Amino acid sequence: MSSQYSNVENLSPQTIRQVMKELQDMESTPPEGIKVLINESDVTDIQALIDGPAGTPYAVGIFRVKLTLSKDFPQTPPKAYFLTKIFHPNVASNGEICVNTLKKDWKPDLGIKHILLTIKCLLIVPNPESALNEEAGKMLLERYDDYSQRARMMTEIHAQPAKCGAGASDAKDDDGPSTKKHAGVDKKLQDKKKEKLLKEKKRMLKRL
């Protein structure tokens, strides 16, 4: 695995303040189906949980994504990765995401929220014409039912709520990013899920 490093010392104080403000705004008023995970010690390491959109093969899943800001941000776009393993035409084997917003359509005034919403939209409308996963792109165009079944199966295996942290490491490849800094957040989320399930079980037992 390649070494991971931070560009936080290379960003201007103004950019750091701007990014942190946007992250805090999203934390207090999250976009629908998106939960941002703030790493206050390194604003260049941005992670979020995205709910699989209804009506798609990803609907039952929660997907962890990572944005890595370059030292020239916002003049140059960040790199985006799925940390949760996913079968999608526009996601490479190491999780890297291919979307025009982060390539030719990038503008410095586009914020983190816009990027995360674009990634969520990519789950609804994949673009097989610019596929990083050629198998998924070809399958989507020629055998959609098979594509949908494969994507749904991968979602059920890797993108379940209890795996939103543990499953992240499954998507790491040689060039994939690390998730260690957010391990504490993962544990809190999983503990809440377990507590909720326990309460539901107790309620069901009382009804018997």
UniProtKB/Swiss-Prot annotation:
Q: Which reaction does it catalyse?
A: S-ubiquitinyl-[E1 ubiquitin-activating enzyme]-L-cysteine + [E2 ubiquitin-conjugating enzyme]-L-cysteine = [E1 ubiquitin-activating enzyme]-L-cysteine + S-ubiquitinyl-[E2 ubiquitin-conjugating enzyme]-L-cysteine
On the tree of life, the source organism's domain of life is: Eukaryota
List this protein's GO terms for biological process. Answer: anaphase-promoting complex-dependent catabolic process; cell division; exit from mitosis; protein ubiquitination
User: Ranges for the UBC core domain?
Assistant: 14-160
Keyword Protein biosynthesis appears in the UniProt entry? no
Asked whether the UniProt record includes Nucleotide-binding among its keywords, one would answer: yes
Q: What EC identifiers does the entry list?
A: 2.3.2.23
Per the record, the coiled-coil ranges are none
Region of interest: Disordered: 161-196
What CDD domains does the database record attribute to this sequence?
A: UBCc_UBE2S
**Matching SMART domains:** UBCc (SM00212)
Q: Which UniProt keywords apply?
A: ATP-binding, Cell cycle, Cell division, Nucleotide-binding, Transferase, Ubl conjugation pathway
- An example molecular function term from Gene Ontology annotations: ubiquitin conjugating enzyme activity
Q: Which family does it belong to?
A: Belongs to the ubiquitin-conjugating enzyme family.
**General function of this protein:** Catalyzes the covalent attachment of ubiquitin to other proteins. Acts as an essential factor of the anaphase promoting complex/cyclosome (APC/C), a cell cycle-regulated ubiquitin ligase that controls progression through mitosis. Acts by specifically elongating polyubiquitin chains initiated by the E2 enzyme vih/UbcH10 on APC/C substrates, enhancing the degradation of APC/C substrates by the proteasome and promoting mitotic exit.
PANTHER family (alphabetical)? UBIQUITIN-CONJUGATING ENZYME E2
- According to UniProt, the name of this protein is Ubiquitin-conjugating enzyme E2 S
Q: Which organism is it from?
A: Drosophila grimshawi
